[in-house]
Amino acid sequence: MSIDFTPDPQLYPFESRWFDSSRGRIHYVDEGTGPPILLCHGNPTWSFLYRDIIVALRDRFRCVAPDYLGFGLSERPSGFGYQIDEHARVIGEFVDHLGLDRYLSMGQDWGGPISMAVAVERADRVRGVVLGNTWFWPADTLAMKAFSRVMSSPPVQYAILRRNFFVERLIPAGTEHRPSSAVMAHYRAVQPNAAARRGVAEMPKQILAARPLLARLAREVPATLGTKPTLLIWGMKDVAFRPKTIIPRLSATFPDHVLVELPNAKHFIQEDAPDRIAAAIIERFG
């Protein structure tokens, strides 16, 4: 299944590019020149989430932002399970296809585990790490486990698939200022029906189901990436990834880190504070 949607060039002023992975066709943007930065989104977003950051960085960095299979403008292939390890393998293929070297790895939400799974297998090619409102270890709080179980229940799965619950409810709830109608239209347009939303519906299940991968990342990220220069950027009003719970663990994992707190940002920091994020990346790595 392909997505028939053309983004507004005023909001998304980028050329669409495509990569035929072993599992399906990936849409991505590749803007600017300079040191590469891989921008990995979460659920239920797509590369559109990074639009303002890309515009701010592309004079200094090569900004590479893929849409996972099942997200954004990428294909919804039959036979793809939309599990996190599958996404990571496809994005790994994509990184190798582009030949990214000495790249910055940025992830938010599920972009954290996916970007880290790619990076641990290519640690010698990773220049630095940028993480925001994310994690990469097995769910270890009652809140995360309960969220996964509730979102995996038949009534909520129905709401995700049939009523676009994640886009309609969680994006507005996860931003300090409700996105404009034009912005929300771009999130809706790439998840037009139940068949298109299978990837969105699977991700909350993966909080528990991806435990083997997350356990491996909990071991391998400190061992392979722990000495990399790191930027932690945190929306301090995020009720899902609470700073007091997660920042101490990330700080211990990456001793060479700089922490930037975004006091007025919630979960979707790229919507709430794109200029602050871009400035922090330039200051740390520019």
Swiss-Prot record:
Residue ranges occupied by any AB hydrolase-1 domain in the UniProt entry: 35-134
Record's keyword annotation contains Hydrolase: yes
Alphabetical list of Pfam families matching this protein: Abhydrolase_1 (PF00561)
EC number(s) reported in the record: 3.8.1.5
Domain of life: Bacteria
Active site: 109, 238, 267
GO CC terms of this entry: extracellular region; membrane; plasma membrane
Keyword field: Hydrolase
Molecular-function GO term, any one: haloalkane dehalogenase activity
Catalytic activity: 1-haloalkane + H2O = a halide anion + a primary alcohol + H(+)
The protein's assembly and partners: Monomer.
HAMAP family: Haloalk_dehal_type1
PANTHER family attached to this UniProt entry: AB HYDROLASE-1 DOMAIN-CONTAINING PROTEIN, HYDROLASE-RELATED
Record-stated family: Belongs to the haloalkane dehalogenase family. Type 1 subfamily.
Role summary: Catalyzes hydrolytic cleavage of carbon-halogen bonds in halogenated aliphatic compounds, leading to the formation of the corresponding primary alcohols, halide ions and protons.
The protein, known as: Haloalkane dehalogenase 2
Origin species: Mycobacterium tuberculosis (strain ATCC 25618 / H37Rv)
